[in-house]
Amino acid sequence: MKPLASLRDIKTRINATKKTSQITKAMEMVLTSKLNRAEKREIVRPYMEKIQEVVANVALAARASHPMLVSRPVKKTGYLVITSDRGLAGAYNSNVLRLVYQTIQKRHASPDEYAIIVIGRVGLSFFRKRNMPVILDITRLPDQPSFADIKEIARKTVGLFADGTFDELYMYYNHYVSAIQQEVTERKLLPLTDLAENKQRTVYEFEPSQEEILDVLLPQYAESLIYGALLDAKASEHAARMTAMKNATDNANELIRTLTLSYNRARQAAITQEITEIVAGANALQ
């Protein structure tokens, strides 16, 4: 009876693994479709770069006198961290959270020296478990977020810098390179000192004044950078989860092959044992 029981156990494992493989394969196909849609949204990047060029020219013409363009003594640092709402995405969340956590531990001696703004339930849970100061959060964003979905937290984030809640803001997210490569990225978002590094210069005539234009343009520009990073992170999330599901499917298929081989060997051994017992019984009767 033992070989039969062993065969049943192996067969049960094979069936269970096949069901798991079917689920992960279906998820992989869905995520491939989501990634394709997310990649199409990446085409906004050249437009954002052009906007940056225009904003830089306006800022340089105004001699960088706007508060959002000027560095000030840093009493408190803000960290905007983009994670996902769900797991099953390989190292997508752990890589970015590890970098943020290590950076904060290195830079700050007290929680009073920094504040965290987090997108995604995984990041929110991570920081709350460690009693780290989260001042803003947003979760349950759609897989293909629009600017309207992120506008409120982006507006509040820029507002917190403007009112002096923190004196600089860093943004952490996964930059999408390709379906198989995503890079954890740290970017200094505020103040917008990188605009001064833009060497391209075009002469404009302004109506109204440069200062009035910057009052409207710079907050909107900073908000658009947050949205651009979110789109980047979403594409990375779909790619990481798609890769994780593909690996899970491949591992399940390999396990099925191994179990099938074990099943066939066990079945052959059981048949051989039965034949041996029959022959032995026949010999005993002679």
Curated annotation (Swiss-Prot):
Q: Where does it sit, as one GO cellular component term?
A: plasma membrane
Give any single GO term for biological process. Answer: proton motive force-driven plasma membrane ATP synthesis
Is Transport given among the entry's keywords? yes
> Per the annotation, which location comes first and is thus the protein's main one?
membrane
Q: Does the keyword Cytoplasm apply?
A: no
* Propeptide residue intervals: 1-4
Q: Which Gene3D superfamilies match?
A: 3.40.1380.10, ATP synthase, gamma subunit, helix hairpin domain
Q: How does it sit in the membrane?
A: Peripheral membrane protein
Name its cellular compartments.
Answer: Cell membrane
Family annotation (InterPro entries) = ATP_synth_F1_ATPase_gsu, ATP_synth_F1_gsu, ATP_synth_F1_gsu_CS
- Cite the GO molecular-function annotations of the record: ATP binding; proton-transporting ATP synthase activity, rotational mechanism
Give the record's keywords alphabetically: ATP synthesis, Cell membrane, CF(1), Hydrogen ion transport, Ion transport, Membrane, Transport
Cystine pairings recorded for this chain: none
Record's PANTHER family?
A: ATP SYNTHASE GAMMA CHAIN, ATP SYNTHASE SUBUNIT GAMMA, MITOCHONDRIAL
Question: Per its database record, what is this protein's job?
Answer: Produces ATP from ADP in the presence of a proton gradient across the membrane. The gamma chain is believed to be important in regulating ATPase activity and the flow of protons through the CF(0) complex.
Q: How does it assemble?
A: F-type ATPases have 2 components, CF(1) - the catalytic core - and CF(0) - the membrane proton channel. CF(1) has five subunits: alpha(3), beta(3), gamma(1), delta(1), epsilon(1). CF(0) has three main subunits: a, b and c.
The text of the family note is: Belongs to the ATPase gamma chain family.
Please state what the protein is called.
Answer: ATP synthase gamma chain
Annotated organism of origin:
Bacillus sp. (strain PS3)
